[in-house]
């Protein structure tokens, strides 16, 4: 009996091993065609849910919140009120709060050595004017007048260059006119205000040559007798008052004419209207 039981157990185990082997072979064969194994669906545990009935107060709050979220139509009054509130907030922020601090430079921050060097450099390089000592008590220029001083120096420099240029140009012109002796007799400043043809006559009209001049061309005199034809005839120009009076008279005459025209036009209109009224009255009657 015992042997038969053992044999039966061995047969069962061998059958099981054969089934497992067959299953492994099937899986190996199926792996050739399927790369992924489909996992078996697992059941999820259901969580018990509790249904709560909302109260009336919560419903009212939800409805109010929904209504607040809805866009309301903007009015001018609401826009102005919002703008005023923003302005008030800004004004409140900008309020001045007095601070308990000392005015001026805080102690210990100034470099004394650096300030002394700057003062020395200014004294050495700055312009010195002795006549300023009576006004400001020091010879150096104050900060406010340094710019005006520099502008005056530049202006004088450019004026000097202009003068040198004029002298050079004058020398060239006189050398071309063979009048270099005039430069030795007169200075450049006196010659600057003269014209090149000062020796000739001032009048644009040519003077008639007389017999005395023809006979004695070298005779020179300070006064000469000249005919009336050499002078320009004097003309009297109208004054400003006369011109203004003439303008006023013209304006008054023009205004009178315009008034007379207006009066005649008004009379014609009235007569025409009167005739029309008479015609209408006769037709009605």
Curated annotation (Swiss-Prot):
Biased segments, Polar residues type: 21-39
A Pfam match: TAF1D
Job description of the protein: Component of the transcription factor SL1/TIF-IB complex, which is involved in the assembly of the PIC (preinitiation complex) during RNA polymerase I-dependent transcription. The rate of PIC formation probably is primarily dependent on the rate of association of SL1/TIF-IB with the rDNA promoter. SL1/TIF-IB is involved in stabilization of nucleolar transcription factor 1/UBTF on rDNA. Formation of SL1/TIF-IB excludes the association of TBP with TFIID subunits.
Taxon lineage: Eukaryota, Metazoa, Chordata, Craniata, Vertebrata
Biased segments, Basic residues type: 85-104
GO biological process: regulation of DNA-templated transcription
Protein name: TATA box-binding protein-associated factor RNA polymerase I subunit D
GO MF entries: DNA binding; identical protein binding
Domain of life: Eukaryota
Organism annotation: Rattus norvegicus
Annotated localization: Nucleus
A cellular-component GO term for this protein: RNA polymerase transcription factor SL1 complex
Start and end residues of each stretch annotated as Disordered: 1-49, 85-112, 193-219, 242-285
Residue numbers bearing the Phosphoserine modification: 24, 134, 229
Subunit (UniProt): Component of the transcription factor SL1/TIF-IB complex, composed of TBP and at least TAF1A, TAF1B, TAF1C and TAF1D. Interacts with UBTF.
Basic and acidic residues compositional bias, start-end: 242-264, 273-285
InterPro entries the record matches: TAF1D
Keywords: DNA-binding, Nucleus, Phosphoprotein, Transcription, Transcription regulation
């Amino acid at each position: 009996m015992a042997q038969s039981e053992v044999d039966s157990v061995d047969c069962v185990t061998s059958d099981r091993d054969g089934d497992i082997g067959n299953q492994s072979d099937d899986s190996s064969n199926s792996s050739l065609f399927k790369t992924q194994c489909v996992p078996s669906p697992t059941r999820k545990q259901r969580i018990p849910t509790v249904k709560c009935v909302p109260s009336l107060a919560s419903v009212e709050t939800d409805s109010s919140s929904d209504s607040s979220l809805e866009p309301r139509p903007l009015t001018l009054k609401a826009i102005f009120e919002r703008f005023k509130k923003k302005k008030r907030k800004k004004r409140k922020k900008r309020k001045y709060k007095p601070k308990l601090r000392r005015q001026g430079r805080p102690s210990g921050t100034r470099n004394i050595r650096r300030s002394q060097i700057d003062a020395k450099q200014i004294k050495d390089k700055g312009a010195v004017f002795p006549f300023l000592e009576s006004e400001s008590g020091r010879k150096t220029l104050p900060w406010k007048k340094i710019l005006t001083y520099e502008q005056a120096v530049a202006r004088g420099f450019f004026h000097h260059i202009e003068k040198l240029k004029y002298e050079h140009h004058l020398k060239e012109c006189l050398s071309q006119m063979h009048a270099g002796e005039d430069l030795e007799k007169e200075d450049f400043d006196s010659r600057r205000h003269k014209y090149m043809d000062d020796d000739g006559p001032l009048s644009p009209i040519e003077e008639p040559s007389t017999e005395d001049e023809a006979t004695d061309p070298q005779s020179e005199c300070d006064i000469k007798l000249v005919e009336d034809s050499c002078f320009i005839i004097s003309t009297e120009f109208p004054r400003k008052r006369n011109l203004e009076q003439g303008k006023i008279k013209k304006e008054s005459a023009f205004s009178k004419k315009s008034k007379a025209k207006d009066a005649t036009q008004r009379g014609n209109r009235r007569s025409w209207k009167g005739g029309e009224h008479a015609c209408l009255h006769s037709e009605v009657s």
